[in-house]
Amino acid sequence: MKKYTFHPQKKPNFGDWQAFIVSRLTIFPHMHYTPYRDLLLKLFPNYLKVRKLPLNGGMTCPNLDGTKGFSGCSYCNNRSFSPVFDQAKVSIQEQLDKFVPRLREKYPNAGILAYLQPYTNTHAPLEHLKGIIDPIIKHEEIAGLAIGTRPDCLEDEKIEYLAEQNKKKPIIVEIGLQTANDLTLAAINRRHTLAEFEDAVKRCQAAGLTVTTHVIVGLPGETMEDFKKTATVVRDLHLAAVKIHPLHIVAGTVMAQDFSAGEIKLLDFEEYCAAVAEMIKIIGTETAIERFSGESPSEMLLAPNWCGERDRIIAKVEELLSRK
């Protein structure tokens, strides 16, 4: 395997994180939110840029394998959002050997943040998790690790293990919430509650882990009040970052069937941007905004056709936030 030499670029010492945020908002008063790159700057101070490297740990989901159910969340098709979906049977070491050099060739000076993305990446016995995570942490080219998971798959022993790894390299635990409305969580077949989410977040934070989440705006039956409640939960839990994206309908899901039957009404572009702007007003600047939208491959996306227009969405949200 070819050896790649890279040179982390040292940035100025900004000192205290909160002071840095204040200074940033002073220099850039138009910024009504904290971009995700600022969180990465805090976690990886030796790099001007950090790039995510999606990896497939070969996991499944308690909502699919019978632990809690077999049908999965009604909106979810992992193939629609994970570029490494087809790597499930490839070992982590093989994936690292294959993908790290490619990313390093493209970004020779960037930090590499490994990202265990598809399914629920703590839904396995601890020893199995160690076999997945240890090689990632030990890899000299990997700066840190982000782990996508559910709140009901974070037992104390797993959190303790992740906390130990966090002493070696930064660990980001991305815990899916989707909405703070328990009735909606039940309706979309999440099979966990808001209380379980809050408990998992607090236990991870108490162990020193960086915790982020992702939420969906526009779930069936929800209104602006629901979106604001979800934003309030994100703010009050002092989460490090949040991904926000509109409900989009992808092939192969229960919601695709309901949408085709005319049973689901999606937010339009203006409604979505207005909701995101109101949520950001509540979330404030302590929590970074990692994503303003989400997208799926065109062959899988049924609606809406604008959800991949990231720049347009950000511009509209910023316009709304700038209004007095």
Where in the sequence are the language-model features?
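Polybasic, lysine-rich low-complexity intrinsically disordered segments
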Residues: 2-3, 10-12
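Core AdoMet radical
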Residues: 79-99, 103-126, 141-154, 170-196, ...
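Acidic (Asp/Glu)-rich catalytic clusters
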Residues: 104, 133-140, 162-170, 205-206
